[in-house]
Amino acid sequence: MNTGLRRGELLALRWESVDFGLQLLTVEGGTAKNRQTRHVALNESATRLLKQWQEQVGGKQRVFEVTTGFKSAWAPLLRRAMITKFRWHDLRHHFASRLVQKGVPLNTVRDLLGHSSVGMSLRYAHLAPDQRREAVAKFD
């Protein structure tokens, strides 16, 4: 939820693409939807969780090794959490929505999500009405 990665990007992520020192992960172009490599900053929470996960899984190459179907692996967790109608993309949408609500510029949201144009990120613009008021207030 704190990275905005697509499911395929997350499942393809390798430990060598995670830089704990810089708090950065690299989504390789071959796994990205638009085929362009991008760098995603990690917040403290995501960094801490990834470090803990790395300690648990040991020397695996991929961050998340999925040996069974992805949906079947998540199903028991979702049931226990009483989450219904879950779609992986909702986590990505939540990430983008929170960024916009916190005042992050749409072009930065575009970069983090790996959208090829800011137009894709514009769907979240309605979540920041205060930014419009703040923008015109600069003329006062």
Where are these regions (language model features)?
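Active-site proximal loops enriched in glycine and acidic residues that flank catalytic Cys/His/Asp
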Residues: 1, 14, 22, 29, ...
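Short, basic (Lys/Arg/His-rich) helix/loop patches that form interaction surfaces
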Residues: 3, 40, 48, 52-65, ...
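Conserved tyrosine-mediated DNA breakage-rejoining catalytic core shared by Y-recombinases
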Residues: 3-52
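Residue-level detector of secondary-structure transition/capping positions
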Residues: 4, 18, 58, 104, ...
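Residue-level signal for well-ordered alpha-helical positions
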Residues: 13, 52-56, 124-127, 138
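Short, polar N-cap/turn motifs at the start of nucleic acid-interacting alpha helices
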Residues: 17-24, 84-85, 104-123, 134
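Catalytic-site neighborhood detector that most strongly recognizes the C-terminal catalytic loop/helix
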Residues: 26-35, 45-47, 113-138
